[in-house]
Amino acid sequence: MQRYFIPKEQFGSTSVRIEGDDAHHLVRVMRAQAGNKIIVSDGLSREALAQITEVDKAVVTAAIIEERPMTAEPRIQVWVAQSLPKADKMETVIQKGTEIGAARFLPFVSERTVVQYDAKKETKRTQRWQKIAKEAAEQAHRNRIPVVEGVHSWKQILEQAAR
């Protein structure tokens, strides 16, 4: 069953609204129709089984059938500190790490990093990585979306580890 993380504001008491990329995915890719069931979560405190009632190009509306208890994430949180690899390999690290349960990703620039790091593109890159983490969490049926931080220096990584 498909799982979607939606903002808390889109959760009503008896229904949910799915908008944006997730609505596009449901309508165009999954070809969802009224009557299909999905799981929706805000990634924080609510998870529900819902049945699609209305399908539009930009918005999918679903009635909440039952609220589900959120299963606990592991008590031990795994953080992945990864020096920036070549090409799009960081995306693979985030995707696979999310699927196996990582809670946070800390990309960093080290002395031996080959990639030419461009600080101007950091915001866009971090947003892309966060989107990949969200999609991997949906696919792996995780309850929470891992945090993908901006690029750090090795010294900053060591300071965070000391806390």
What are these regions (language model features)?
Residues 1-69, 120:
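N-terminal positively charged helical leader segments and presequences
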